[in-house]
Amino acid sequence: HGAEERELFLVSALGVISGMLPNYTGNYFGSNVGTNLYCFVVGAYGTGKGALKWARQLGEITHLNRLDEAKEEEARHKRDKVQYNMQLALYNKGKLAEPPTEPAQPRHLKLFIPANTTKTAVMQLLEENDGNGIIFETEGDTLADMLRQDYGNFSDVLRKAFHHEPISFFRRSNNEDVDVPRPALSVILSGTYDQLLKLIPSIDNGLYSRFCFYILEGNDTFRNPFDKDDFNHGHYLAQSAEEFKQLYLALSYREDDMKFFLNERQQQRFVSHFAHLKEWTQSTISEEMDGSVNRMAVMCYRIAMILSILRYYRLH
């Protein structure tokens, strides 16, 4: 379709892919950073934001694969539970010297984490999925409404996860403290400007500088929805989704991280560009935007990581 729709797909696809690259890190200020991005597409009603659904398809096969793994864990847990109850009965009758160990609860494995959920549920899903997850929501106020609720306000989780800072919570069902040492969360949202303001009311909000935004202008002409030459998105994306699943699994099985590096020339260009941008922002807009430029640099570095591993994967 048009250039704007292709750009929209590119932005949202980068967001989805950024959440599908586990065990892949780069060194940034001495810390290991992953590829995770927060993206928000802003546009009026009916301007074509629905194209985001194609980007979500890139992770759909991986998501379904995770759900199948969860079903297998649940079936295994049921079998182990039967065995545990039998051994417990024998122990209670004095026929076993040691009490049996109760099997751990099955994990809720998935790639996509629902936005309309509680803070504790989000942290639990991250913990059960090795800290990884993607929040993908085409109506931005779904997340905004949850963040306004006391039980659903996980804004602090989003802010910490952007930098992979540890998060912790108390699991009442097992009466235990749970830590997620390195959350790696990606977020892809779309909505109108009013919906954006519900989520991020001002630049002072900590989420503002963590998101990359794409402004969708829309198209004045009415497109023919019956065009027979229209591209078969479904077939192409199904093939791509399978490739991304294979890449996701290959990285998941690694015992150590795959590393990303910039060479000396690239490092110099990177530092020079953002130093100039920071000076320009301070003199032209406001010194209060310093943090936004710093995080913009992190996003740029992460996009470079994504593009590099995709090229590497295709070549190898």
Question: What is each PLM-predicted segment?
Answer:
Residues H1-H316:
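Phosphate-handling catalytic cores of nucleic-acid transaction enzymes
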